[in-house]
């Protein structure tokens, strides 16, 4: 039974405002725009994902998006950077691949052999990603050596999109992930670090891609994990937090609910009050979503608010169904090969 008060005002979803907001963000040239160069490729993915989920992908010019992504190719590393002339990184590489997959399932733009004597871009991307895996199964984000479970998910997802995920990579990567499982039922960045909802998604999502979810069946790990996830719902607001004793944040509508969806336990939380919390985070005047009601909007929270609504009831909003493993529409991910021998 929902905890939504009977006199709660019904809040409508204003799609046109959010489409306008995203388009403006993707073409913005403010001071804040230049301060966030390091997130530009991620921001493009957030905007494109929100638009395609709302069935409004045509709001951005497809060729302009693809041209920008290819400007971010770093020929030195064989990967994508977050901005033209930035070094390649695993995070921006996944975002680039996700957007390219949305527009071109076959990734034909990566098959050009003319620009580099070192092979085509697809081959070089696979070499870059696989070269970041360490002996313990973890992945670095780039050559500078930072390691955490985000990069495991990012690498595994990228290789899946490239149809290059092998058993040898999956076996060691999944072993590292399970080392990051905590006594409280969550996952952390590295072994022994604090449990966090976003890290739970990266670990559960990676295990799903690698067909390794059965590793959670040992020693009641799945039961503990589901309990930890359901405890993230904060009353009376209905939103999720990322850790115990923290405020709810609309982005966890994705990180928590996607993990529960992968584990087939989405209905173990109150979806009605969660939906209401998400809708209260809208800026109904200018569009976009914020982390909490009344705060400043941004494209990151907008993307994951819309993705959360799709998980709750995509038909109600006229959205595309979203894949909880990849955070992309099912119509795109249904053709992915999650693991190859």
UniProtKB/Swiss-Prot annotation:
Cofactors, names only: Zn(2+)
Molecular function GO labels: Rab geranylgeranyltransferase activity; small GTPase binding; zinc ion binding
Catalytic activities: geranylgeranyl diphosphate + L-cysteinyl-[protein] = S-geranylgeranyl-L-cysteinyl-[protein] + diphosphate
Lineage, broadest ranks: Eukaryota, Fungi, Dikarya, Ascomycota, Saccharomycotina
Enzyme Commission designation: 2.5.1.60
Protein name per its UniProtKB record: Geranylgeranyl transferase type-2 subunit beta
Assembly information from the UniProt record: Heterodimer of an alpha and a beta subunit.
Main enzyme class: transferase
Binding, Zn(2+): 249, 251, 301
UniProt-annotated binding residues for geranylgeranyl diphosphate: 196-198, 243-255
Species of provenance: Candida albicans
């Amino acid at each position: 039974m929902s905890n939504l008060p009977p006199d709660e005002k019904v809040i409508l979803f204003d799609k046109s405002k959010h489409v306008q907001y995203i388009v403006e963000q993707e073409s913005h040239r403010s001071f804040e725009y230049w301060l966030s160069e390091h997130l530009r490729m991620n921001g493009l993915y957030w905007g494109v994902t929100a638009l395609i989920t709302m069935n409004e992908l045509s709001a951005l010019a497809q060729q302009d998006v693809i041209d920008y992504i290819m400007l971010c190719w770093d020929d030195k590393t064989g990967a994508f950077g977050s901005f033209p002339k930035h070094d390649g990184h695993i995070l921006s590489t996944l975002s680039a691949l996700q957007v390219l997959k949305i527009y071109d399932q076959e990734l034909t733009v990566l098959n050009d052999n003319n620009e580099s004597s070192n092979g085509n871009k697809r081959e070089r991307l696979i070499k870059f990603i696989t070269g970041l895996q360490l002996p313990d199964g973890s992945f670095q984000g780039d050559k500078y050596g930072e390691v955490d479970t985000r990069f495991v998910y990012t690498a595994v997802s990228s290789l899946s999109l490239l149809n290059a995920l092998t058993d040898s990579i999956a076996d060691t990567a999944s072993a590292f992930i399970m080392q990051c499982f905590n006594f409280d039922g969550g996952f952390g960045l590295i072994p022994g670090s604090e449990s966090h909802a976003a890290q739970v998604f990266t670990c559960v999502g990676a295990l799903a891609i690698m067909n390794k979810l059965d590793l959670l069946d040992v020693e009641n790990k799945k039961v503990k994990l589901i309990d930890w996830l359901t405890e993230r719902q904060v009353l009376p607001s209905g939103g999720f937090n990322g850790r115990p004793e923290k405020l709810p944040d609309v982005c966890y509508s994705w990180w928590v609910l996607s993990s529960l969806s992968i584990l087939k336990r989405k209905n173990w939380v109150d979806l009605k009050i969660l939906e209401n919390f998400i809708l209260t985070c809208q800026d109904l005047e200018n569009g976009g979503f914020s982390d909490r009601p009344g705060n400043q909007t941004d494209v990151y929270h907008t993307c994951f608010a819309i993705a959360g609504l799709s998980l709750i009831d995509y038909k109600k909003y006229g959205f595309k169904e979203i894949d909880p493993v990849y955070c992309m529409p099912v119509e795109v991910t249904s053709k992915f090969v999650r693991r190859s021998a």
